[in-house]
Amino acid sequence: YDKVLGASNLSMLRYEWVWYKSRCTGFLNARRAPLKKTENILVFYQKLPLYNPQFEQGKPYKKIAGNNGNSTNYGKFTRSGSGSEDGLRFPGNVLTFPAVQRTVHPTQKPVALCEYFIKTYTRPGEVVADICAGSATTAVAALNTGRRFICFETVPAYYAAATERIRLARSALEAGEKGV
């Protein structure tokens, strides 16, 4: 599906994130194709959006290269920074979050994955929209990260479960915990 979606608007497709899951899917086709351990998350935009990279922990290092550089892609440039004494690194595009074990919805994503994207592309207090809310994972992640949310779900069984999950998440936050 992501290939069709990406091809539908190549002029606005910018890049993809790859979610490496802890569980495979696609067992019914296992004799015809490899099991699927990843899902692609596509990023589209016309104008550069807010981007707050979620730094990854790595080994501390000091800068060892000269001050100026030349790149075939970017031309001449001046390096900035002096290394990473705390070991923090810019994120790569492969994210590892365990799959949800007990799901309400068949395509339910982990809250931590949604929190990652919400923190990457929004500021606290902003509104996050999910037009296919399913089990309300995005709403729970928005609450956990101090954002507001607008969600839509048209399937009555999922809507009921989603509203209960949001209620429980709000209660957890009031008790000083995170919603799940």
Regions found by a protein language model. Give the residues of each.
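Core catalytic lobe of class I
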Residues: Y1-A161
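S-adenosyl-L-methionine
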Residues: E164, L168-V180
